[in-house]
Amino acid sequence: MEFDFAELPAQDRYRLLVSFVAPRPIALVTTVDAHGCNNAAPMSFFNVFSQEPPLVILGMQTRPDGTVKDTVANIKRSGEFVVHMVDMSIAQEMIVTGINFPSDIDEIEFAGLTSVPSVKVTPPRIKEAPCAMECRVAQTIDYERRTIVLGEVVQMHVRDECLDERGRYVRPEVYQPIARLHADNYIVADRQFVLKKPTDLLHHEEAAGYGERKPEKLPG
């Protein structure tokens, strides 16, 4: 099948994109409004973008009436936000924060989660999350119905048991983030497998200037 996106209705473009670009990690984003009220919202148009500089990217759509959502307004006003990864321990709470509450409702508190102070930004982080990344805005890109935010990670919090004793490697049996497939369908990252490049072809990388590749020692 072929699809000309110039001729395709927006809803059909959305359906195709999110159904095939999947699973997508969930970012539970916290911000603060001008009155000091906390806001939390989940989004699946999200990913890590770079490690140097350390960037994450968020894509946030307007409300059906075209007005800007609280998360976007708060980020543009303050230039700060916190991204939390989501696992099964806070999956139901994450869904609750996705309800379109009035702006004066603290979704963190309403969902039964605990807000604790961040280190380098004003918005709080969620204590129960397995991982939290404090971010400052690096760039925003505005479209008619969507805002793209690039955020630089300035501080990262990780639940102790998610890492090995050296704090270097993720323990996959412990950290199992959930991701969105499409509609109300989600998946858990609880199955991993190894795929390695053929060793007899690695000389091509050395010839291209990558140098000799030494296998990284894994924990255990």
Per-range role (PLM):
Residues 1-220:
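Basic, polyanion-binding surface patches
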